[in-house]
């Protein structure tokens, strides 16, 4: 029986070009996971969109002397190009600027307020006396009080991952001019996280199979006691506060509003499908599953704050899993768009076949620990694994099959060595599927590539290019078994490398059309020559 699978992916700030860390951290893993579940017959909705209200956008707009909307339009368009080139298959990729998103955000705000878990309170907020304005959290930088990282932001430390308020920073400075930030009292709406502490703790303790760094961080954070958190700010760029009692110059703050995008994007998808009620299948059905693909800096917002908001709202499904990835490191430093660490994604897309790039990233996904990446290692994996192992396997079996087609005799019997390689194909399907369902995608990819090496070993042992010259039936049996195994690999590679895998599958004629099981290749059918799948880097 098929399941409803909601795949929620981090909303990128529409403030700058993306890099490999973003793709390997969230977007590629989500796409692999979603593609697999579609293949096995589950009903999948994968949603995200460009976050247009994040303060990095206004920071960039200020620096460039333009309006925020100009920055948003530029980078949202650029992001759409990424997804197209990388074959990221969204059911809905939208923005937080739509009327639908604003409506859903305001409805959630009012419902939580009605439930008694949003209230007005006074807070101290960073203020720039020279500019005579309150500073959004990301306009403040200083030393982290936890790990002493010198470039911590007013909302979070990129080094240790702790969420912060600007007043907690040591020597806080305004990013507008580098001068010392002052702090003044202002009134805002607060989410009463403290009232949800016990409920959230109980829920976290019930979760099984989460990545250790995600569950351990989340439990530790909650054990310290959740503090009520302001969900509005003194801003002129953001979603309006409904029934605002605070006065002008305040908006709903982005950390509260952006995560609501998962719900608003699903509702938008349902409307696009012609049935506005379809979203309920993924948010109200208790058998539906939801997975949140984010980087580790987003763990507090997706494993703590968003579940708290859902609890405060009531009735909506809580996350099934938050398989957050660690960081991809460039020479030991976290890739960062805002700090210019690492080549942009466009740099790689200009040079790499998208499937080669997906494979290189998929093979080093930082699922448990930070992963160091270098272009030399990516090139090695492309040349040795894609070109020399997988691509060469396809090429030599296809060429032997096509060149000897007139002499093939399909009235053959398989012997033990042939049956063994096909049994291994069945085992590979099972193991690979199990790894993907546990969101252990790197292990899944390694499992398929290991099977590729076993097929190559099978060919080296059986030598069909020699056997076919003196025993047509035996040579045909070997090539048929190898081709069946290649078809299986193409199926299993499909979530990781959809374009080249489909090329292989389109060339093969089958009696069956299984997506995640061994297929029966049609005996006597011609095979299409597809040429080289991948290019070798010098």
Spans of model-derived segments:
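Structured secondary-structure scaffolds
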Residues: 1-41, 45-48, 100-104, 170-403, ...
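A non-catalytic, amphipathic alpha-helix used as a structural packing/dimerization or gating element
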Residues: 32, 70, 74-81, 107, ...
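Residue-level recognition of alpha-helical structural elements
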Residues: 68, 214-215, 379, 386, ...
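Alpha-helical scaffold segments in carbohydrate-active enzymes
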Residues: 104-111, 258-261, 389-400, 431, ...
